[in-house]
Amino acid sequence: MTQSSNQTKDRVQRLGKVAVLMGGVAAERDVSLRSGAEVLKALKSEGVDAVGCDVTSVAQLVEIAQKYDRAFIALHGRWGEDGGVQAVLDSLALPYTGSGMTASALAMDKLRTKWLWKGVGLPTPAFIVVSPSRPLDVETFDLTFPVIVKPSHEGSSIGMRKVDTLDALQEAVDFAQQYDSEILIEQWITGREFTCAVLDGEALPMIQLKTDHDFYDFDAKYQSNTTEYLCPCGLEIAEEKRIQALVLQAFDAVGARHWGRVDLMLDDQNQPWLIEINTVPGMTDHSLVPMAAKAVDLSFSKLVLKLISLTLP
């Protein structure tokens, strides 16, 4: 047995029993179950003693902390990705993958993430906020159409719509408010769409997304077979490195750790615009972080093993 395989075997033993947390109570429950199933299969293929856990309550987390040595969080959306689960696991002293409570809560909040990025001088599209205390006022609306309307606290593009006219704006806001009381109306950026994964402090190769939809929506992410993923992304090496450095700044500003993904646009003048950050990216067969990892010869199972290993002291 080689030294490398000995080290892997030792690491697997040190991991102990791993709970893969999936499902949850958010609108992204089905996606989470798919991510969790893939993660569980990968961990088992690497010899890890892992069990899938469909969690929907704090009581379940308390029970899990008594039975397992660490957790792989494959929960997407509210509670699982917004700091709720992370806070409980912190209180139970159970190590887990991904960002801590504060960074998770911030990253899940698109509005406050944008305020933070703007405050530290990072580029993000202009926006306005609609909430119960700030109703939409078409008389003072000063963004240029088109715009994109999105719930502040949802993922997977749930509740999002592109709007081309003032007449259609209220309908899009009403639709988004089915998912969240706080709505973001953001300036539409015409250009190319990219995503950049971050793994253990390093930016992975960027991916350019091409879709025949208006934007990279839920269907384009999880169901469409026409979405194109370009990796290499088509940028010059120096340009990609420049944007990767920006991505790391955005990731660090939020206080994220272990892994994540930053989505951005590159406009017609090659100006990058930060859109959002995901601290528990999808891990399905359509997902982007595994695709970027593959570009640096990191298989899905090795990626998952690396992530859970980041919970070791």
Swiss-Prot record:
Q: Which PANTHER family does UniProt cross-reference here?
A: D-ALANINE--D-ALANINE LIGASE, D-ALANINE--D-ALANINE LIGASE B
What GO CC annotations are associated with the protein? cytosol
- Give residues annotated as binding Mg(2+) 2: E276, N278
**Keywords assigned:** ATP-binding, Cell shape, Cell wall biogenesis/degradation, Cytoplasm, Ligase, Magnesium, Manganese, Metal-binding, Nucleotide-binding, Peptidoglycan synthesis
- Subcellular localization(s) per the UniProt record: Cytoplasm
Q: In which family does this protein belong, per the annotation?
A: Belongs to the D-alanine--D-alanine ligase family.
Q: List, in alphabetical order, the Gene Ontology terms for molecular function in this entry.
A: ATP binding; D-alanine-D-alanine ligase activity; metal ion binding
- Keyword Isomerase carried by entry: no
Residues crossing the lipid bilayer are none
Residues in ATP-grasp domain copies? 114-309
Question: NCBIfam families from the entry?
Answer: D_ala_D_alaTIGR, PRK01372.1
The protein, known as: D-alanine--D-alanine ligase
The main location is cytoplasm
Q: Which InterPro entries match?
A: ATP-grasp, ATP_grasp_subdomain_1, D-Ala_lig_Van_CS, D_ala_D_ala, Dala_Dala_lig_C, Dala_Dala_lig_N, PreATP-grasp_dom_sf
Gene name in the database record? ddl
Sequence positions that bind ATP? 142-195
Name the needed cofactors: Mg(2+); Mn(2+)
Give the residues the record marks as binding Mg(2+) 1: D263, E276
Q: Which organism is it from?
A: Hydrogenovibrio crunogenus (strain DSM 25203 / XCL-2)
Is Cytoplasm among this UniProt entry's keywords? yes
